[in-house]
């Protein structure tokens, strides 16, 4: 597997956070979120990051100034992002469009971009420095809905990091907003090419509710995972190029090798390795939940420009012992089954379930959620410096892994997977992964983490 950068020490100097407001007056109103948006499973902040190289044709342009000004213009059209959430009866979330603004941080780091990105990328290692968690900003209700940090590197490259309140948008909705910012940075004068559409009633629960599906992803079960598996969580990224994917495919029967997508093969491998690494009881029920986009699904006519959540996490269940000891095809069939569940009717069933069951959280015990962000467009956002050398997820969560696109130093395209596991489980995970890829996998202590010094 790919190696990580050597131990580095760098200093990040940040200015005090400021609030960026819409550049023109916007309506003061209340706007309800949909019954997909405000479920418990979306009440968290999700970070993404983009890295840009120095471009000679942009000499003299300050990315901080360029982004800040374009952001203010974009917020005129996406003014709910400048508001704050309030919670009404039955935990219903509503945006109070106050135009208070979004948090913005200007920063400088005494490091070069190529020192952070090499054969692979591990943004979770240094995310806290490139996206400062402003005290008091981490909540869902009454807090800024976006946090942005633009960090300049001494080489002329820079990073754009953003943290989104997930109840407001899914990743595709975020990309639509970022595309609008990018259009303004490149000289758009009037309005975004795709006007934003609110219409959150589009995914409101039906009256009366109708739940024709069994939603394994929301079943509330007793958590029997050992406490040791919940401590000392460690972040790490893994790069899977064509060579690694071929090695994983070799564990499948011939009839599956050519008919299974890279996502199917990779997700089955990760689910198996993670299940083994956590040492779960063989009789324990485990789940694979695949984040699925509802746009384009039969029976769901999503308005063009809609930037709310249009995603669900359909799941399939198996015994941990089957996943960890059976051939890889068992895990892969579970992945394929989870993907196949998603339809427009399924998403509406989720909305009805939320209202009927009090907006439950997704299952925690034995669940593994994967979100493929390789095709959402984060790697195409051009603020005037061209496409980013990396644009994608910035950090995993204990139950959630994200996939991003990445091209290594050899020019080889592949998938970066962000993982979050307890230290001991991460070591076992890498050993299991080594068996699947047939290559050496750097152990968690084979490299020294990047050291950073923060200064305001």
From Swiss-Prot:
| InterPro entries assigned | CAT-like_dom_sf (IPR023213), Plant_acyltransferase (IPR050898)
Keyword terms, alphabetized: Acyltransferase, Transferase
Query: Which residues are annotated as active site?
Result: 166, 382
Q: Does the keyword Cell membrane apply?
A: no
One Pfam family, short name? Transferase
Q: Which GO terms describe its molecular function?
A: acyltransferase activity
Residues that span the membrane, as ranges? none
Keyword flag Transferase: yes
Protein EC: 2.3.1.-
Expression induction or repression? Induced by ethylene in ripe fruits.
Its biological purpose is as follows:
Involved in the biosynthesis of volatile esters which confer kiwifruit flavor. Alcohol acyl transferase that can use a wide range of alcohols as substrate to produce esters.
The UniProt entry's sequence similarity note says: Belongs to the plant acyltransferase family.
> What is the protein's given name?
Alcohol acyltransferase 17
According to its UniProt entry, this protein's organism is Actinidia deliciosa
């Amino acid at each position: 597997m790919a190696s990580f950068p050597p131990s580095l020490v760098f200093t990040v100097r940040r200015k005090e956070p400021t609030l960026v407001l819409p550049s023109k007056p916007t309506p003061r109103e209340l706007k309800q979120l949909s019954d997909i948006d405000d479920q418990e499973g979306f009440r968290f902040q999700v970070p993404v990051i983009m890295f840009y190289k120095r471009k000679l044709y942009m000499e003299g342009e300050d990315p901080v100034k360029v982004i800040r000004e374009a952001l203010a213009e974009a917020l005129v059209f996406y003014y709910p992002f400048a508001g704050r959430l309030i919670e009404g009866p039955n935990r219903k979330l509503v945006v109070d469009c106050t135009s208070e603004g979004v948090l913005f941080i200007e920063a400088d780091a005494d490091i070069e971009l190529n020192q952070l990105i090499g054969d692979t990328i591990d943004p979770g290692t240094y995310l806290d420095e490139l996206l400062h968690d402003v005290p008091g900003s981490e909540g869902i209700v009454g807090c800024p809905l976006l946090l942005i940090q633009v960090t300049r590197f001494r080489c002329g490259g820079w990073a754009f990091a953003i943290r989104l309140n997930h109840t407001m948008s899914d990743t595709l909705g975020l990309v639509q907003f970022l595309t609008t910012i990018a259009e303004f940075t490149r000289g758009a004068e009037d309005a975004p090419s795709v006007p934003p559409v609110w219409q959150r009633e589009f995914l409101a629960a039906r009256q009366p509710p109708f739940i024709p599906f069994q939603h394994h992803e929301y079943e509330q079960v007793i958590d029997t995972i050992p406490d040791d598996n919940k401590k000392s969580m460690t972040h790490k990224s893994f790069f899977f190029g064509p060579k690694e994917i071929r090695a994983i495919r070799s564990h499948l029967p011939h009839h599956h090798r050519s008919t299974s997508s890279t996502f199917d093969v990779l997700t089955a491998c990760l689910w198996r390795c993670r299940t083994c690494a956590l040492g779960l009881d063989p009789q324990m029920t485990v789940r694979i939940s695949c984040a699925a986009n509802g746009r384009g699904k039969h029976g769901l006519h999503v308005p063009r420009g809609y930037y709310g959540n249009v995603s669900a996490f359909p799941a399939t269940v198996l015994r941990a012992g089957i996943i960890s000891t059976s051939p890889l095809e068992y895990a892969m069939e579970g992945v394929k089954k989870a993907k196949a569940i998603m339809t427009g009717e399924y998403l509406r069933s989720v909305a009805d379930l939320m209202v009927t069951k009090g907006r439950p959280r997704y299952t925690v015990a034995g669940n593994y959620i994967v979100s493929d962000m390789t095709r959402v467009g984060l790697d195409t956002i051009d603020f005037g410096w061209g496409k980013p050398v990396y644009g994608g997820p910035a950090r995993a969560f204990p139950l959630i892994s994200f996939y991003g696109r990445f091209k290594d130093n050899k020019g080889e395209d592949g998938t970066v997977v962000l993982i979050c596991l307890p230290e001991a489980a991460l070591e076992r995970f890498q050993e299991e992964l080594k068996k699947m890829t047939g290559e050496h996998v750097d152990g968690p202590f084979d490299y020294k983490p990047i050291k950073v010094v923060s200064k305001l």
